[in-house]
A protein has these predicted regions:
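Phosphate/diphosphate ligand-binding glycine-rich loop within oxidoreductases
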Residues: 90-208
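Short helix-loop-beta connector
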Residues: 209-214, 290-291
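Rossmann-like adenosine-cofactor binding region
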Residues: 248-319, 323
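Active-site capping/gating segments
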Residues: 203-204, 301, 316-340
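NAD(P)-binding Rossmann-fold cofactor-contacting core
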Residues: 234-250
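N-terminal signal-anchor transmembrane alpha helix of single-pass membrane proteins
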Residues: 2-24
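Glycine-rich adenosine-cofactor-binding loop
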Residues: 101, 195-198, 205, 213-232
Length: 341
């Protein structure tokens, strides 16, 4: 009886081995090992153990874009160049103002006006326009249709007049213009000329000039004419002094001790001594100056010119043109800011 019993056990053992091998070779069959997995559902198994191909798919490196392949006869197409950005100002202002003349490196008007515009919250900007020729003023106005006005400095204070529509009465009398108002009317442009140099001179130097009776005006340019107009208004006798002398204009060689003693006011209306040539000064006999003399310089840069310095060394009172520049600028803005005319 033992032998048949052993045969039966052997058959059962072989069947079990076969079943185990079948389970190992077929992992999708979930009937094997269900007792050791407890009550875990198929859904929970899938959540805890994602498929192997999904795991590898999620961890694969991203595919690189294939680079173009070119044969020897095929050249790569050039990348299109970006269109250049248009050159535009950082801000478009409602109104433009400026200064015309040549040279303009010495001028401080742009800094002063733009500070004024910022402080007063005025939508405007002031630029320097250095013109090679006064004829370029027409191109300037065409280029900037929002140009509302401009100042004029050397050497164009008299040359600008033929380009103006009209002059105000004072500018007509002086024969020089330092302020122009630009009006746009009925599709056209009107240029009206004014002179605020004489206003600036009067307000800046008027108090110092009290008690003086005779003045020498060095130079015969546009600002010289404005100074003469102001001195005439004050009742101060005056004479021009120039290298080009004639019956009415004295020469520098005529400045004798007696002449220097007679004229106790000397006004420098030349650009001599203006920045950057700060070591230069008009050729007058400074040794004849004394404490009774008053030297006035319309130059605003530098604050103290060599003309002023030499005058002070001989006891004279001296004042520069910085305040005069500010006063004439205030008068110019009042003209530009008026509505109509």
């Amino acid at each position: 009886m033992v032998f048949p019993f052993l045969v039966v056990l052997t058959i059962i053992f072989l069947a079990l081995v076969k079943n185990v091998n079948s389970k190992l070779n077929n992992p999708d069959d979930t009937s094997f090992g269900s007792e050791t997995s407890g009550s875990q559902s198929e859904e929970n198994k899938d959540d805890d153990f994602p498929p192997v191909d999904e795991v590898f798919q999620n961890n694969k490196e991203p595919e690189r874009e294939s680079e173009p392949v070119f044969t020897q006869t095929q050249e790569p197409e050039p990348e299109p160049k970006p269109e250049p950005e248009p050159v535009v100002p950082l801000k478009t202002y409602d109104s433009l103002y400026g200064l015309i003349g040549k040279p303009l490196a010495h001028s401080t008007s742009m800094v002063r006006f733009n500070k004024f515009f910022r402080d007063q919250h005025i939508d405007a900007h002031y630029n320097n326009y250095e013109l090679e020729s006064i004829e370029d003023v027409t191109k300037l106005i065409e280029k900037y249709p929002n140009l509302r006005g401009f100042n004029v400095t050397i050497p164009y204070k008299q040359d600008i007049i033929p380009y103006l529509t009209r002059l105000d009465e004072t500018a007509q009398s002086i024969g020089a213009v330092n302020t122009v108002k630009v009006l746009h009317r009925d599709g056209g442009v009107e240029l009206i000329g004014y002179n605020t140099d004489w206003t600036g001179f009067t307000k800046s130097f008027g108090e110092l000039l009290e008690g003086h009776s005779k003045a020498l005006i060095l130079g015969t340019g546009g600002v010289s004419k404005a100074v003469k107009y102001a001195l005439d208004k004050m009742g101060i006798e005056n004479r021009f002094v120039s290298r080009n002398s004639n019956f009415e204009i004295m020469g520098y060689y005529e400045l004798s001790p007696s002449v220097m003693d007679e004229f106790d006011v000397i006004v420098n209306c030349t650009p001599i001594g203006m920045w950057p040539d700060v070591n230069q000064c008009p050729d007058i006999p400074y040794g004849f100056l004394s404490e009774k003399h008053l030297l006035l310089d319309v130059i605003a840069n530098p604050d103290e010119t060599m003309f002023m310095k030499k005058g002070r060394e001989h006891g004279a009172t001296a004042k520069g043109g910085k305040d005069m520049l500010e006063q004439q600028a205030v008068a110019a803005w009042e003209i530009w800011d008026r509505i109509g005319e």
